[in-house]
């Protein structure tokens, strides 16, 4: 079940660009990219997840554009069909935040999401 859930989440994030689980970012990553992590291993009911958007830029324009696409898709709930059920991705709180980075050539923002998991 967890493998199907992670596959579904990857499918969701990849529609906005290259996406990785936060612990599996390749060393030779190309910008922009998205990372995501789950706040729980227990996929019963609702789970909090967060994603970060990274851009190699001097402005937050690219980060904000990608964030807006993710926010728009999750605003009313985004359904992801998985084997044996579905996931529904909603906005969490706070929705979107800019993250200061010590490397001034990289811009980062993060989004909080809630995933409702319904499996048989």
Q: Whereabouts are the PLM-identified features?
A:
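Charged, amphipathic alpha-helical segments and their flanking helix caps
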Residues: 1-20, 27-31, 35-120
């Amino acid at each position: 079940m967890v493998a199907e859930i992670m596959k579904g989440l990857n499918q969701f994030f990849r529609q906005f660009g290259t996406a990785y689980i936060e612990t599996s970012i390749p060393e030779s990553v190309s910008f922009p990219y998205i990372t995501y992590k789950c706040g729980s291993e227990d996929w019963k009911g609702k789970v909090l997840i967060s994603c970060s958007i990274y851009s190699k830029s001097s402005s937050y324009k690219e980060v904000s554009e990608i964030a807006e696409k993710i926010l728009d898709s999750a605003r009313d709930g985004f359904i992801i069909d998985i084997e044996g059920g579905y996931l529904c991705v909603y906005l969490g709180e706070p929705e979107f935040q800019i993250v200061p980075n010590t490397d001034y050539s990289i811009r980062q923002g993060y989004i909080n999401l809630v995933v409702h998991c319904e499996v048989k």
